[in-house]
């Protein structure tokens, strides 16, 4: 479930809901989890659908890249994305969770061809800040980010366990994103939420229940960066897809972009022709 809002009018803010998670922490659990060795992740990877028609990919891209499921200030049907390097900083005293998050960021960077994303050494150097909190501190953290009144509205309408929001400029370029994740709900859910929230903070903010293969479906849990969503993010971050584009403008360039994206996703995942 996703909420998009303008508050104040110059601020584009979207709040995404997902079932979130985190763990109790054994020394090498972060390495194991990020390597896809959790049984819940491994079983999903074995059963994953990896072959899609052009129309299946395009449908999912258009549904997730435009608009948002829940709005406070109307619909905005324009492409929103970062137009430069993305640097992520994690604020937490949980070294295991920070290690997992860094591996998630590295995985995203490996699989999205034209996205320059990496961890930052400080909050000041980051344009994506990830706050890792205990579940009992979530509402207080939301209040510190968005104010008590907005936090109550979020809790009443969405009852989130994790969320993210971004600020864009007048050209629909994302300037800054905030992600809030809880750390004490289990490994699988932590990774599931970390992937979805980080990816949605990059632009594809619309959850949809009509596309069964995407993690941007509230009925789907992944825990890893699946092939279908790699198509969506690679389409979004192709240089020919520009911030501020309308649906019609995107459709005009999609065929050529999709040809190149298919070749990249096939290569990086070692998929058969």
Please place each PLM-identified region on the residue numbering.
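Disordered inhibitory propeptide/activation segment of secreted metzincin zinc metalloprotease zymogens
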Residues: 29-86, 160-169, 270
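Short hydrophobic beta-strand segments
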Residues: 83-95
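Bacterial N-terminal signal peptides
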Residues: 14-25
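Bacterial N-terminal signal peptides that target proteins for export
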Residues: 3-16
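N-terminal post-signal-peptidase region of extra-cytosolic proteins
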Residues: 64-75, 89-90, 100-102, 111-116
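Metzincin-family zinc-dependent endopeptidase catalytic domain
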Residues: 99-195, 200-211
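Metalloprotease/metallohydrolase-associated module, dominated by Zn2+-dependent proteases
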Residues: 44, 72, 151-189, 205-273
């Amino acid at each position: 479930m996703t909420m998009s809002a303008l508050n104040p009018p110059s601020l584009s803010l979207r709040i995404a809901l997902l079932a979130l998670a985190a763990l109790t922490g054994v020394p090498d659990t972060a390495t194991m989890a990020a390597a896809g060795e959790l049984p819940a992740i491994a079983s999903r990877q074995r059963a994953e659908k990896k072959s899609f028609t052009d129309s299946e990919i395009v449908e999912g891209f258009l549904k997730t890249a435009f608009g948002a499921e829940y709005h406070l200030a109307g619909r905005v049907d324009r492409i929103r994305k970062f137009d430069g390097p993305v640097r992520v900083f994690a604020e937490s005293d949980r070294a295991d969770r920070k290690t997992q998050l860094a591996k998630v960021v590295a995985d995203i960077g490996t699989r999205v061809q034209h996205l320059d994303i990496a961890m930052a050494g400080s909050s000041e150097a980051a344009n994506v800040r990830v706050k890792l909190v205990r579940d009992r501190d979530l509402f207080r953290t939301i209040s510190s980010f968005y104010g008590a009144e907005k936090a109550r509205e979020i809790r009443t309408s969405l009852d989130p366990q994790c969320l993210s929001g971004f600020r864009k400029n007048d050209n629909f370029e994302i300037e800054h994103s905030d992600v809030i994740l809880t750390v004490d709900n289990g490994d699988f859910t932590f990774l599931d939420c970390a992937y979805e929230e980080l990816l949605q903070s990059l632009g594809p903010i619309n959850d949809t229940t009509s596309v069964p293969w995407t993690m941007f479906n509230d009925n789907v849990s992944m825990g890893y960066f699946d092939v279908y969503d790699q198509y969506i993010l690679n389409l979004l971050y192709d240089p020919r897809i520009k911030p501020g584009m309308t649906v019609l403008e995107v459709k005009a360039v999609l065929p050529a972009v999709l040809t190149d994206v298919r070749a990249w996703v096939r290569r990086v995942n070692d998929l058969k022709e």
